[in-house]
């Protein structure tokens, strides 16, 4: 009888110890999962939006200094951010997911399937805004000429011809992503919103290279 009771006691003790061990492992996993991740340390696939949904967001709807709005496009994060001066501070106003060139790196020539990069010291500018609702393009994929630019085409003044910010008719499933021939694509709804609320001829546009670190004002306004 004593031997049976002793065996039962040992079994209960072992089971209790095992349950405590599992609970401890589960608790550690939860703590690890909740740890904040630095976007600069994320694998490129995550940082570029391949594994996360992204939608347009407006962060500030108040008044900002006239003529102070500018754009920063991140090749790494696949986002177009609108900034402006509010009470003396550079403030994040809005954000849109984008589709950029199929290939990474600095654009060197027409047709190389790369989006050009620039710096804050030498930004690109919006040189004209055109109604592109009837424009077609043949991507060479067998579909022939198709509507491909959305409602608006915002032409950029760059060292290369034909680069602009436009809609994404028929390809919005690749947003955000890397599929353009060099232009910056927004969804059709987003290009309309961006044009109506922020874009204007002469607006500065900075397109950051994949390895370009965040500017101080970007770090201060991470959302």
Please provide the spans of the model-predicted regions.
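Alpha-helical transmembrane segments
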Residues: 12-16
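Exported/periplasmic cell-wall-interacting domains
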Residues: 46, 59, 132-223
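Bacterial signal peptide processing site
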Residues: 23-25
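C-terminal motif of bacterial Sec signal peptides marking the signal peptidase cleavage site
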Residues: 18-21
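Gly/Pro-biased beta-strand-loop elements
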Residues: 49-166
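Post-signal peptide N-terminal segment of mature Sec-exported envelope proteins
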Residues: 30-52
